[in-house]
Amino acid sequence: MPQLDTTPWFITILSMIITLFILFQSNMSKYLYPLEPQPKTLKTQLYNAPWETKWTKIYLPHSLHLH
């Protein structure tokens, strides 16, 4: 059974990594980034849940127990 020749693997893998790095860098250089990023002000909104606006049975006085 013949042996697998792995001699060109190193240069193939190395050239693939270098090519991917160059492609990635060229794609990232197309984007414009702000020089001094400013923090974004977030508006906090208050949401009223239905159980906060109406009375429920746990807030009512205890009812009389009928025996």
UniProtKB/Swiss-Prot annotation:
TM segment ranges: 8-24
GO cellular-component term (any): mitochondrial membrane
Location of N6-succinyllysine modifications: 54
GO molecular function: proton transmembrane transporter activity
Domain of life: Eukaryota
Compartments in which it is found: Mitochondrion membrane
Pfam families: ATP-synt_8
List of residues that carry N6-acetyllysine: 54, 57
Membrane topology of the entry: Single-pass membrane protein
Signal peptide feature range: none
InterPro entries associated with the record: ATP8_mammal (IPR039017), ATP8_metazoa (IPR001421)
Alphabetized UniProt keyword annotations: Acetylation, ATP synthesis, CF(0), Hydrogen ion transport, Ion transport, Membrane, Mitochondrion, Transmembrane, Transmembrane helix, Transport
Family: Belongs to the ATPase protein 8 family.
Subunit structure of this chain's protein: Component of the ATP synthase complex composed at least of ATP5F1A/subunit alpha, ATP5F1B/subunit beta, ATP5MC1/subunit c (homooctomer), MT-ATP6/subunit a, MT-ATP8/subunit 8, ATP5ME/subunit e, ATP5MF/subunit f, ATP5MG/subunit g, ATP5MK/subunit k, ATP5MJ/subunit j, ATP5F1C/subunit gamma, ATP5F1D/subunit delta, ATP5F1E/subunit epsilon, ATP5PF/subunit F6, ATP5PB/subunit b, ATP5PD/subunit d, ATP5PO/subunit OSCP.
Name of the featured protein: ATP synthase F(0) complex subunit 8
Native source species: Orycteropus afer
The organism's taxonomic lineage, starting at the top: Eukaryota, Metazoa, Chordata, Craniata, Vertebrata
